[in-house]
Each structure stands twice: as C-alpha cells, then as structure tokens.
C-alpha cells in the first residue's frame, strides 16, 4: 500500500518510466491456458481411474458401482491422498499432489500454481454439475409415466409417507435437537427422502421376489419416490439460492416446481412429435442424441432462469422423450455420454467430503458423529414406517416393504452433491449425509434377505400348494 502511494506521486512518475513502475508493483501470476488444460486432463485421468477401481470392486461384492465411485473419490480427495482437492474445501495449490506433479513435469512455476489450481477446480466442478444434469436426464428417460400413473394407492401411500416421515423427522431433529441452522437442516432432511430403486430391484430379483405383491409395491413406490424426491431437491436447492425460508416462499417454490414439471410434460406431448419428425429428416451423425441434448439443456436453462434447479428441467426432458418411439435408441446413445460425465460427479462428491471431521479421537468431531448416527436412524425408521401405511392386507409383509425403501444409493448422492456445491452444508453435516447414504446402501441388501427368508423355489412351491 505504501509503495503504491509513493509510486503514484507526480514527482516520482516524472523521473521514473511508467513501464518500470508497472513491473515494480507485485502482480498476480496469470494462469497459462495449456497448463490449465494439462491440470484438467490429469484430474480426469485420476477421476476415471478411481471411479473404475471403486466401481469394479463394489460390483464384485454385489453393491452399486456408484458407491464405489464415491469411495474412490474419498480416497483420492481431501480425506486421504489429496490427489484431487478443491478451493471451496479450503485447500490450496500446495495441498494438491496434482499441482506438485505438474510443477515437476512441466514449466509450471510456484507463483502461477495458485491460478492454475483455481481454474482447474472451476472446470472440474462445472463438468461435475454437467454430469448430474445428464444423470437426471437419463433417470427421466428410464422412467415410465404410464407406469407412474398406474401405480396403485398402496404404493402411492408408501411413497408419500416415505418422503414426509424422514423429511420432517430429520429436519425437526436437526433444527430443534442439534441446533443446526434452518437451511442446512432442511437440506439434510431432504436428503433422507431419496430411495434407490436399482439396489432394491436387484436384491428382489435375486430373491425371486420382484414380481411378488411386496416387490411390486416397493418398485411402484420407489418410482413415485424418485419424482417426489427430485421435486423436493429442486425446492430445497432453490431455498438456498433465495435464502428465504418463509412458508410463503416454500409454497411458491413447491407450486412452481410442480407446475413446471406438469406443464413441461403436457407441452412436451405436442413438441415431441415435432422433434421426432425433425430427427427423421436429418442425415448427419448424432442427429438424435444432439437434438435430445439441446431439448434437455434448454429445459435445464429455463428451470434455472425461473429460480428452480437445472436438474429438474433435465429430468422433465427425459420424461417427455421417454414417451416417444425413439426412447430405446436414445437410451443407448446417452449411455456413453453418461459414462464420461456422471463418474466425474460421483467422484467429486467423495473427493470434496472431509471424513476427517468424523474422527472420534478429536473431541470437536463428536457432534458430526452424533449427526451421522441420528441421520442413519431416521433414514431407516422413516422408510420402515412407510411400509406399515398399508392397511387391511395382513397377507403382505409390511416390514419387507419398508426395508426395501431404505437404500439411498445414487439419488442420495445427488442430494449430497448439490448440497456441497451450494455451500450451505457444514463439513460435519455434509460428511454425516455421505455416511448415511453409504451405510443405508450397505445395510439394505442383507436386511432384505432377512425379512424375505424364503427362496424363489419355496415361493413357487407354496403357490402350487395353494392352487391344489
């Protein structure tokens, strides 16, 4: 500051060339574009290796690969190796092994490392956010609106209760019991609403129960749960943007999200035939995929413009295009795009999570451990309660239905990722949500095997005896 005041004096500037004064003052080093690209490429190499190793290990023990991608991110992230760290977590260029490697193998100077580190973090974060947009588009594309509308009242009751009970229990418990601020408490409560249909469906198929009464109710409820969960996520993320948690604002956002989703679906029925016809007239490569992505990104932008979340627009686009004759073909073409971008999202969620805040040997970390334990209990009880909302059906295994709704899986990780990106969650709350997602995903398969003790063969024999 003193140097700047001296050099700005008219007397000094009359005798010293301005070019010398300009170089004399300390200027921040500029990041070289080629070095930023090199750091991003090295980050992607690290991300993809971690995602494949983690995914392969989990798939071999009958767990969802996305869980392995998350754990892979934790290993290479701030919690363990420090290969992939981000400025928003409080890390600097000195904490990044990738920056250290670049300084050893390129002409990256220590003075420019900070600028390259910041730029690298921004690029990877944007790719991560694009990955979750593609993921929600893919989920929408795989959803069946007709199936959603045909789901019976029993599945609907299970789904609605399975969203409300953990959301209210988690939010109220964190806010009143632990003194967590309102918006983080609401977001953590919202993360408890998710259900991973893929994990439960796989276990039910292995047990021969997928087509049982309980299996059909679980699958139907999980489909509704996905839609309700995404609406809840969009509303809560919008609350973070506005910073206003008044009842009137919540009602406005809920109505806006619902109206946007319904309006897009209704309007899409008129637009989709035009899009399909346009695709049929095109002769260039990628005509279907690019047209679909234009539609998805446009709706994602519109959702963002009206203070909702981009993922809601992408999900709505998937729902609309799922009703066209191009659905199967589009599903196949989206997979490679998802394979490139979605792992970036899941690995980054893990990499940004500091599990060190849950270290029990540090007294100040015990609050985070208690939060994690509380979220796990509410996550399990809230879904189990939902199974007992089916009345007048003593022949149905209600406990099995509730247990089938427990795993959070990739949907829970989407909540954690969006919460992390928003900056609304404290490190302990974010880590507690991640632990909740991991443990509910791990616990659900063995729990299902306990509440469904009979094998498929036993079930077939029982049905034969009833028939005779």
Question: Model regions: which residues?
Answer:
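Transmembrane helical cores of multi-pass secondary ion antiporters/exchangers
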Residues: 2-468
């Amino acid at each position: 500051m003193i140097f700047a005041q001296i050099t700005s004096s008219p007397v000094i500037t009359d005798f010293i060339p301005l070019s010398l004064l300009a170089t004399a003052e300390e200027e921040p080093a500029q990041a070289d574009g080629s070095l930023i690209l090199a750091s991003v490429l090295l980050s992607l190499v690290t991300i993809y290796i971690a995602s494949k190793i983690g995914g392969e290990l989990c798939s071999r023990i009958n767990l969802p690969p996305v869980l392995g991608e998350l754990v892979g991110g934790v290993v290479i992230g701030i919690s363990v190796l420090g290969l992939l760290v981000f400025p928003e977590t409080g890390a600097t260029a000195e904490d990044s092994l990738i920056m250290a490697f670049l300084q050893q193998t390129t002409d990256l100077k220590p003075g420019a490392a900070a600028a390259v580190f910041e730029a690298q973090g921004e690029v990877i974060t944007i790719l991560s956010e694009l990955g979750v947009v593609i993921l929600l588009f893919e989920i929408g594309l795989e959803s069946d609106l007709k199936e959603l509308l045909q789901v019976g009242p029993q599945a609907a009751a299970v789904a609605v209760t399975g969203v409300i009970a953990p959301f209210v229990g988690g939010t109220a418990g964190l806010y009143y019991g632990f003194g967590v601020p309102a918006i983080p408490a609401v977001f953590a409560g919202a993360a408890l609403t998710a259900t991973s249909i893929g994990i439960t469906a796989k276990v039910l198929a292995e047990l021969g129960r997928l087509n049982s009464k309980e299996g059909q109710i679980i699958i139907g409820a999980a489909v509704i749960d996905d839609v309700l969960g995404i609406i809840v996520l969009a509303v809560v993320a919008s609350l973070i943007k506005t910073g206003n948690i008044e009842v009137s604002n919540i009602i406005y956002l809920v109505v806006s999200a619902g109206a946007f989703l319904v309006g897009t679906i209704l309007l899409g029925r008129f637009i989709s035939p035009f899009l399909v016809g346009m695709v049929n007239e095109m002769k260039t490569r990628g005509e279907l995929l690019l047209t679909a992505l234009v539609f998805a990104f446009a709706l994602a932008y519109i959702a963002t413009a009206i203070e909702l979340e981009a993922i809601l627009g992408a999900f709505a686009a998937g729902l609309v295009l799922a009703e066209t004759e191009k659905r199967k073909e589009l599903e196949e073409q989206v997979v490679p795009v998802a394979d490139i971008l979605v792992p970036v999202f899941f690995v980054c969620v893990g990499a940004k999570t500091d599990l060190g805040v849950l270290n029990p040997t540090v007294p100040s970390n015990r609050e985070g451990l208690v939060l994690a334990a509380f979220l796990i209990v509410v996550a399990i009880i809230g879904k189990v309660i939902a199974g007992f909302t089916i009345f007048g059906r003593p022949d149905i295994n209600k406990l099995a239905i509730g247990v089938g709704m427990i795993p959070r899986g990739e949907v829970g990780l989407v909540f954690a990722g969006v919460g992390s990106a928003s900056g609304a969650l404290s490190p302990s709350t974010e880590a507690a949500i991640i632990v909740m997602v991991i443990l509910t995903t791990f616990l659900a398969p063995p729990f299902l095997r306990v509440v469904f003790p009979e094998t498929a063969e036993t079930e077939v024999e029982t049905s034969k005896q009833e028939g005779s």
